[in-house]
């Protein structure tokens, strides 16, 4: 286990995939050629299937396009299954893939419950399972994603810093995503731990939009009508929260209501920052997450361990981004293909 974890650190820090396979070079006299031979045996020709909650969102598309590019270079067969926000369909796709028996499944859970049993069955069938950003209640071989409690705390502290001083109404509103997802639960827990320390902050609305831009827009419009002196809106995902931004602009409150959001640095986040529609975006870089998912998948394939042996977590760093520090590389363009 120590060797696996040490290798994981090397993989993620340097992009190096040589420390697994047959073991340390110095200890066993392995040559670079022998390591490459073992790597080819363990990795090349293997199959990875990626099942996001939808492939029609910029975030999940960035993950898929980046992983597909890496897989092509590594000689890994990579495919994508799109349930298009249909939870029942996602469960059916996962069950179908278990029967097809790929080497690795990369799964994006809509909530903590619905895919848990299927993920466990996948491991029992000899398939490695990597969960991304939204974990299930079942711990699979690996989790890659932002640490949601930390994310929620960081965002809430930003809200407090912006709205806790004199001259502010101290009123804020929250826009959750899917309330039963581990990601949403963690953000809420982290945020509330901060807000409880600042009783001057008044939460006038706490609603959920289920990741839907229009729902977020409509609910925000109602809140803004009731509270035109709102100081800030804190949302759980930039794709959803673009609807809040439009509601703020339509209400004539641009520059008055500060929108705090988060996401993988996908469009239109950076454009919204430079235009003043978003105040601060707590970015967990989507391309880095894709790199992490592929590195972990390679590690598992080379480990020789039975699926279900390891429970590894790899947390993506959070990059607070505003109009002052946003750059051309802060966000990732996404292809429509």
Regions found by a protein language model. Give the residues of each.
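Extracytoplasmic "Venus flytrap"
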Residues: 30-66, 70, 74, 78-92, ...
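Short beta-strand elements in bilobed, periplasmic/extracellular small-molecule ligand-binding domains
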Residues: 72-83, 171-174, 195-213
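Flexible loop/hinge segments that line or gate small-molecule binding clefts
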Residues: 112-150, 171, 265-274, 278-279, ...
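Short, solvent-exposed amphipathic alpha-helices that sit
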Residues: 59-73, 151-158, 182-201, 215, ...
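Hinge/cleft segment of the Venus flytrap/periplasmic-binding protein
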Residues: 28-46, 175, 179, 183, ...
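Hydrophobic alpha-helical
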Residues: 104-124, 191, 209-271
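Hydrophobic alpha-helical segments within soluble ligand-binding/sensing domains
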Residues: 35, 42, 90, 144-170, ...
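Short beta-strand elements at the ligand-binding edges of bilobed clamshell
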Residues: 80, 136-161, 174-176, 206, ...
């Amino acid at each position: 286990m120590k060797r696996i974890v040490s290798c994981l650190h090397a993989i993620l820090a340097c992009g190096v995939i040589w420390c697994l396979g047959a073991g340390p070079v110095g200890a066993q006299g392995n040559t670079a050629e022998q390591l490459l031979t073992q790597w080819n045996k363990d990795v090349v020709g293997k199959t990875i299937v990626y099942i996001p909650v939808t492939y029609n969102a910029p975030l999940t598309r960035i993950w898929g396009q980046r992983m597909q590019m890496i897989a092509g270079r590594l000689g890994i067969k990579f495919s994508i299954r799109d349930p298009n926000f249909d939870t029942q369909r996602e469960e059916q796709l996962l069950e179908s893939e278990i029967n097809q028996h790929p080497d690795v499944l990369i799964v994006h859970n809509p909530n903590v419950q619905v895919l848990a049993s299927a993920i466990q069955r996948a491991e029992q069938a000899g398939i490695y399972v990597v969960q991304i950003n939204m974990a299930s209640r079942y711990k699979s071989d690996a989790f890659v994603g932002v640490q949601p409690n930390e994310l929620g705390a960081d965002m809430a502290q930003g809200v407090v810093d912006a709205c806790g001083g004199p001259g502010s109404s101290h009123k804020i509103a929250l826009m959750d995503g899917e309330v039963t997802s581990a990601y949403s639960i963690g953000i809420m827990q982290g945020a509330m731990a901060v807000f409880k320390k600042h009783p001057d902050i008044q939460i006038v609305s706490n609603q959920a939009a289920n990741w839907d831009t229009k729902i977020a827009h409509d609910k925000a419009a109602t809140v803004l009508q009731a509270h035109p002196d709102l100081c800030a809106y804190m949302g759980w995902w930039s794709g959803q929260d673009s609807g809040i931004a439009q509601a703020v602009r339509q209400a004539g409150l641009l520059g008055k209501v500060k929108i705090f959001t988060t996401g993988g640095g996908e469009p239109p986040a950076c454009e919204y920052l430079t235009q003043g529609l978003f105040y601060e975006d707590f970015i967990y870089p989507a391309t880095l997450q894709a790199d992490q998912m592929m590195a972990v998948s390679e590690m598992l394939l080379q480990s020789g361990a039975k699926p279900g042996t390891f429970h590894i977590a790899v947390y993506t760093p959070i990059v607070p981004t505003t109009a002052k520090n946003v750059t051309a590389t802060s966000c990732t363009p996404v292809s429509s293909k």
